[in-house]
Amino acid sequence: MAIEFGDHSSGFHHTEVIRFINNEVLKNGGSSEFYTTFRSRSWNEIEDQLRTILVDPKVPRSLKRACTWSALALSVRVAARQRQQQARRVWRLQDQVGEHESASWTLVSELQRLREERDQAAAQLLCTQIILQEAMDEREILRGRLLQAKRSALPVVPERGMEYGKTSLLSFEEKELGDLEFIGSQNMSHLEAQIPILSCLPGLSSPWVQAMDPFLQMTMAHPVPLKAKFSLEFSFSTPVPCPALMDSEATATAMITGLPQIAPSGIQPSSLCVTLESQETIASALDQICPRQKECSEILQDVSHLADSISCCEGEGPEKPQGTSLHGDSSNNSHKDNQAIPQIMAATEKKNLMMHQGTAAVEVNSNHSIKEEPVMPKGISSQGNKTSSTKKKRPKISRRVVGLIESISHNTQCVSVTPQETHTQVNKTTSTLKTYPGNLLRKPDQGKILSCNQKEDSKTLQRLTDLGEGTRNCQKEDTFQQTTCLNAGVSPNEKKMPQGTGKNQSQRQKEEPNSFQANHPRKCKSYLMNKYPKIQLATKQRVKQPEGIKSLESKQPQETKSSESKQQEKPLSHRTSANCICPSSKTVNRSWYKGCYKCAKTSA
């Protein structure tokens, strides 16, 4: 039989179908060989074998029918087998789907966990950013507090320049005090009423140099009468002394009564002596100082360059007589242009070594000026009248001169010159006068011509009267040793001066108004010798004086008296509401004096 009953893999479930198929195979002469041979093969192979049998003509028809029924039963079997295979495949696929689903669920849970972690990380990051911002803000606050604490804890450190200035000032104070003690013993015999005003303040409480308030420039009368003999009168502002440095409380009280008010923070500046120059020289000095202030940003550098230029003038000798006046006027006008002159003069006094060379050059220039225009206090009086006439022609320059002298009067300095320097100056002056005697014939009748100008303009003479008071104050502060020596050196040659060229000189004054440019050599010399005597005094303090100098000092008072007596032959008398001039002694007396205190004292 071809198909077995109960074979589930055959694909047939009913036995009637299986019996019918078996009977048909058997009736046609077939057997179960074809079914059994192709039972495990695929349908394609079964179909190919059936085609071969059906095409073969040698196979009987009944056999072909039996093979066809066996192939039909095999097709059902193949279908059943495929169904089973597909069922298993489906089961397998289902298993895979389940597995995939379980994997997806696992991934979903993992994804959810990662999302939660991400959210937590984002929240933590946000919190961290907030905390960081708060920390940065707190750091800035603490940093500001720390900087504020450091600023409050830092000490006030002065600048290097100020520290050097303080050290130099202290060392200069010690030298100056020693010099003043040494000179005071020599000059006390020549001073009847000396006002002690030092050029600097010792013991500054602060290293910082305080700026001095500008002075109130005004014409005031000095409360103490002075003994110096001057025919000219200058308007001035009384210099301010330091009460702590006065020799006595009485002198300090007398000085303070006539002083202008000064701010308490001001520092007494280094002083200058008044030097009266011709108006042309002062105008040229003003022109000289203006471009210098434009070129240099600090006036201290101007003073340094000025010291270098004076050092260079030492080798040129008397060929440049106008350098001294320009130098003095440049320094004086610096105070007018800039109220910071105390710091400048303090720095100038620090450079005394360089200024010593400049002083030597100034001595030579002053001697050359004496060679051309040798005049005594009478000549100074005539020069004052010449200044009055010049003020009429050039009122602007006159006002500049008055303002200049008023500014200079705040800077007067009480200094001295050693006998060695005086002896050197006398020798130079005497030799120069002998070498050029022809130039001494210029000034005999100058007083007459210029006294007429005083009568023409009483207002100008009153201004000169006030100006003379300033000169008397300034030269009273200077030691009389220098003035005595200079006058003694010039007077022997002035005795030999002929008197026949006065008219020629008056004509020359009309033609050449600039001829009086070097008219005050003694004032130029005394100004610069008073300005820079420190190094000379320090170097010559311990040197013994030669015998010739001592003998010269003994002769100086007599020669001074003789020269002054000759100069007083033509007195200049004038009286104003503020003061009066004695005709005999040419002494300026205050309005409250009934007579001349000098004549009364001399007669007594």
From Swiss-Prot:
Biased composition regions of type Polar residues, renumbered to the chain: 322-333
This protein's record includes keyword Translocase: no
Comp. bias regions, Basic and acidic residues: 544-572
Sorted UniProt keywords: RNA-binding, Transcription, Transcription regulation
Pfam families, alphabetized: TEX13
Region (Disordered): 314-337, 374-397, 485-523, 538-580
Family according to the record: Belongs to the TEX13 family.
Known function: Plays a role in transcriptional repression.
Protein name according to UniProt: Testis-expressed protein 13C-1
Gene (name only): Tex13c1
